[in-house]
Amino acid sequence: MNFTDSHCHLDFDAFSNERPQLISQCASANIHQIIIPATHPANWQTVLNLASKENYHGCNLFACLGIHPWFLEGLTIAHLDDLARAVEQSTGPSIENKSKKIIAIGEAGIDGGIAKQQDNLNQQIMFFNYQLALAKQYQLPVIVHHRQSHHYIIPLLKKAKLTAGGVIHAFSGSYQQAKEYIDLGFKLGVGGTITYPRAKKTINTISRLP
């Protein structure tokens, strides 16, 4: 059986000295597809460069482009315009090497844990909505970050009416919230939290899903 890692930040500097070895280990464990979400304009090109390598150490790497809510400080609407251009350039029919095409928008989302001030929350919502609009325009899935923010994210996803769904990264939440995401066409990413005995709500939720 072959597996896909739906969320791996292989582009981060922490992996620079051991990236080939890590990818080879993934291939040895039958993980042959790895999706790399971007987090900030500064790492878009690194993500695209990694995804351009075909069958890299036994794995196919796939790129996503987006802006993570943790990294909004100093960013403006101009950076969203840059994202729109980068997405257009990475999805156009003129691209000869299909591996250079992005497969999703993200990582995008809302983090209630850092939204201590209304201005920050408003910025997060603006950036998230913009990226949802890009996903709808290009019929791409969205890789969604959440923390203490289902009550913001679910209504925005309902309003966006996306056609390609996406993945709710490292889902933790109630059964009702999980069902709402699934009904919107999203998959739930399950991280290491599911192995923690204290994560009773998430364990119960996942066990009840089809």
Region locations from a protein language model:
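Mid-domain alpha/beta scaffold segments of enzyme catalytic cores
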Residues: 1-210
